[in-house]
Amino acid sequence: MKWLIILGVLGMIGWAISSTMTAMNTKTTTVYAGKAILQAQVADNDALRQKGLGGRSSIGRDAAMIFVFDKDGDLPMWMKDMETSIDIIWLNDKKKVVHVENNVEPDFEPHEVYRSPMPARYVLETRAGTAKKFGIKPGLSVRFELEDQK
């Protein structure tokens, strides 16, 4: 019985380390959106998408995160653990902007959920004000490459 408990604890520790390492192994890509050139972390798995930009007290002027999903759909986003305002930009499978939420502020429980009225494949999160500053709006084509698309 004692060994089963020890094995269970070791298994949980291994799972936690694996999840943390997956979240830390972040890929990056350059995103060209309007007049903006952004260096984006790629969130292409559940662990990275759940963490998102949460816990960061600031976001650099040319920093972003691109959330990658397997198929188009309703991609709800929330501000869990966010400490700074952001712009949320939804893109379809052709990497065309379908919706923008400007200057979304951090919130507390219960978290407000933000959605695009159109199906999307990607979500780009940037520092608040980036979309307006660089003319990122619905209809704009965005360019970026992902490792599995090269």
Where are the regions that the model predicts?
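Compact, glycine-rich, soluble single-domain proteins
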Residues: 14-150
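Hydrophobic membrane-insertion alpha-helices, especially the h-region
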Residues: 2-18
